[in-house]
Amino acid sequence: GCEIDGDYSEVKVDYAAQGQTILMNNYRQYIDPKYSVRQILVEHRHFNDPAKKENLKKLLLRCPAQGAIPIINYNDPLSSEEIDKVELQELAKSRKDVVHCMDNDETASQIACLVKCKTLLIYTSTLGIYSDPADEKTLIRNITGKDSYELINAVCDAQSKCIGSSRVGANGAVAKLEYIKEPLKNGSEVFIANPRFSISEVIGGQAPCTKIFISK
């Protein structure tokens, strides 16, 4: 198509809409043809509104039986940052567990909670979580606890090592560890890894990464 000119915010929305078709085409190209591919665009409303949340849950839970792989993204083309901000502020007046859904890691964690998934894999630009964010040799391979309470404490300890570091992206690590707390409480195993390693390599233990789980 042609290059789009005009108001920056509108151009960004227009390109986001075009990008969805490119993204889905890429997934269709690389996913085994025996599986169907489904695009699911979400906003904070799909997690904060009980009826919408239940509909999303049912849609996702039907996918495995129907041989479908859901590709979930934020609905950028139809979302408004200003409107979302106002809506979220209103929700925060009456409840504490408001989902913002402004970050892919937060969205992934909310999906994991919704369907109570066994495994949650979050890709990042690093190999995982470091005890010293300035030194990649300090990769934390396992964060464990005998129960969810002990595990969350271990995650908080890992977060404290990220705060105040000079390494670019360390604050992103803090956010990732915060978002995964709820899935961990639900019993999910979480992997934080680098996308140069395949899903099977990460989950199979053949890739350097951080695995977070309740020890048995």
Regions found by a protein language model. Give the residues of each.
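C-terminal catalytic "cap/lid" subdomain
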Residues: 1-216
